[in-house]
């Protein structure tokens, strides 16, 4: 069984992120990189030197509704605002989980839960966050529900990535 790590990710982390989240959609190498990766909190599971599950979180600025771009490269799809941030109906500071993924050969073994739990722990204990938000691909919604996250907002589509739902968890 792998163990969860956090800190500054190496290239293997980004290779796993690309292999799981972008390459299957035919997106170019580099689309796995986000403009704020250097400031984000990263967690991953490593097993025998192989990065098998990844995820990241960032604090949503106090003046932001969470809208933005899907990645830092050209042609990035827009990401909609989170309703509770736009209407000021959730507690700040708030954080967003992004880029969660597990290699297909290691899925359904609890690795994503380890990564998500570590990100939640770090954002609450080290950054004082009170609310978490994320945009889940449709197939991932049952996983996030099992971890205590609730659906908010209506379904929407993010470019070639596909249908998503926004979710929230209060801490």
Where would I find each of the regions flagged by the language model?
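Conserved short alpha-helix immediately C-terminal to the canonical SAM/SAH-binding motif I
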Residues: 115, 140-143
């Amino acid at each position: 069984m792998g163990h969860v790590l956090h800190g500054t990710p190496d290239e293997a982390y980004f290779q796993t992120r690309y292999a799981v989240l972008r390459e299957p959609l035919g997106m170019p190498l580099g689309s796995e990189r986000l403009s704020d990766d250097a400031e984000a909190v990263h967690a991953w599971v490593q097993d025998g030197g192989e990065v098998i599950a990844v995820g990241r979180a960032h604090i949503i600025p106090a003046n932001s509704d969470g809208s933005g771009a899907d990645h830092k490269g050209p042609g990035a799809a827009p990401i909609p605002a989170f309703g509770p941030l736009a209407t000021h109906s959730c507690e700040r500071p708030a954080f967003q989980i992004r880029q969660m993924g597990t290699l297909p050969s290691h899925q359904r073994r609890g690795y994503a839960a380890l990564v998500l739990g570590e990100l939640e722990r770090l954002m609450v204990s080290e950054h004082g966050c009170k609310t978490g938000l994320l945009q889940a691909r449709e197939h991932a919604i049952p996983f996030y529900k099992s971890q205590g996250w609730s659906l908010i907002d209506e379904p929407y589509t993010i470019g070639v990535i596909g249908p998503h739902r926004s979710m929230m968890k209060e801490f």
